[in-house]
Amino acid sequence: MSTKSKDQHARVSYLYQASQLLFRNVQEPTLSRHYISTAKDVSQKSVMRIHPDIKRTICKGCNSLLVPGKSCSIRFEEPSRKNPSIDRVLWICKKCAFKKRFSDKSC
């Protein structure tokens, strides 16, 4: 990993952690969304992938942090007829109503 990519990775990580802190402790969702948006821009410009665990906590519609009970609601969907062994979890953003579906194993 080059020095430039390490710097970009550290910047994205810092912005994500700062947005979490602002959202949970200071109750500043607007600034938190701005930091998430900036982190996504930095990762796209440097062609760097964001870890899937971090992606799962960000709304694609409005860049809000998805915190169960505060900014999103979680529902468990019925198993499909094609794959009855896979349970699905539905995360719904309370700000923009964007829906994210995950298999239960990935959450």
From Swiss-Prot:
Give the CC-aspect GO terms.
cytosol; nucleolar ribonuclease P complex; nucleus
Annotated localization: Cytoplasm; Nucleus
InterPro entries in the cross-refs? Rpr2/Snm1/Rpp21 (IPR007175)
Q: Which domain of life is it from?
A: Eukaryota
Q: What stretches pass through the bilayer?
A: none
> What is this enzyme's class at the first EC digit?
hydrolase
**Known function:** Component of ribonuclease P, a protein complex that generates mature tRNA molecules by cleaving their 5'-ends.
Stated name of the protein: Ribonuclease P protein subunit rpr2
Lineage of the organism: Eukaryota, Fungi, Dikarya, Ascomycota, Taphrinomycotina
